[in-house]
Amino acid sequence: NFKNKITGKCTPAKFANMANLFTSLELIKNESSDLVYFVEDDYIHTKESITEMLFTFEKLSTIFNEDVFLLPADYPYLYSKSDNTKIFLGHKKHWRLVDESLVTFLTSKKVVIENFKNLMQMATKWEDPWEKPLHEIYKKVPCFSPIPSLSMHCANINSVYGLPPNIDWKNIWDENKNYK
């Protein structure tokens, strides 16, 4: 029961997201894995997404001499600003330095533990934007988004956020429809 753990007025869907994040953060404390992938249930991934992210994590962490965040999606809304950016070569794709994301990302357990308080704030206190504590972490820990995208956030299909460009998402959907 999360009603006494989560504060602020939010929709039932946001409350469920917060409860899931809370549970995930608690589980990570006892997890032995080096890397963790927070993934919401409304993303479709390309077949190469996990492999690309794992090899790119190793490469970019080596370049920056610190662990990083990797997003599977190239969120179109991040192109609505005229900020300068930096592009790096990952395993087989280009990766763009970004300062915002939603709540699907890969990073190290170490980064999660070091930023546990800020991440737990997202799980216990509704703020708008909900991801603001995560964006604050990106000021200290580099975050990258793939070009082109490795996934699509299905909630964005009819929203101002839009679909990641240059991918045949209908084909990806068809390739994934038999996976359970």
Q: Language-model features: where?
A:
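Conserved beta-strand scaffold positions in the cores of enzyme catalytic domains, especially
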Residues: 7-12, 69, 143-145
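Phosphate/oxyanion-binding active-site loops and adjacent basic polyanion-contact surfaces
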Residues: 13-24, 45-49, 101, 126
